Amino acid sequence: RRVFEERALIDGGFEAIVSGHRKGTGSSRETAPQCERWSGIRLVIAASFAPIHERNNINLGQLMGDHSILERLQNGDSIDLSEFTSKYDPITRLILENGGILPFAKKLNNGEIILPESTTLERPMTMVEKIIAQKMIGKNRDGTFVKPGDAILAAVDGGYSHEFTTAQVHTFLKNEYGDDYSIPNPIKFAVFEDHLLYATNVPKFSPHIAKIETLRDMQKIFQRHT
């Protein structure tokens, strides 16, 4: 019997989830925190977090804290938002405090958020640093320079999505921008079937064929937006 039954989280009415050390180890895919987020979880407590899992939580706007935060909440204390965000760089704080990467990006595009100015002075840069500096969003001057450790946003030239992530991406963009959303420069964005290409004829996948077909259908819907 499963220790954690299907739909136990989404039907449980939970708002917080509590774990031990290195929460998310082995769960680097975005799906792990996405399942928690869209099951109603808004506060994630752990003794420590695996780095990729922590980053994915940040991008979803999930507040994270340790067990001392949990004890204070159990004692009825009010905790200021800054206690959850102050340890991060200025841009990460903005992402968290505005509800995640998509709400943040929408507000940034609408001019509701101003990015911190780059303060790195002129310096020799590697080829990668030069590319990043050229692509930096919100450059405050010509000849912008970057250095290791700078927190910046940079525009990308292209991207991709496969059928294990497309359904979620489509849902998130639709929720944020509406049914008629579009992505910038779609000709540079690839959409392809990868993980489930041969799943129909794999016996262990047979109990999940209906869900697999849903993922494939959502892939086609997303393609029409790209």
Model-found features: residue ranges?
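Fe-S-dependent hydro-lyases/dehydratases of central metabolism
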Residues: 1-226
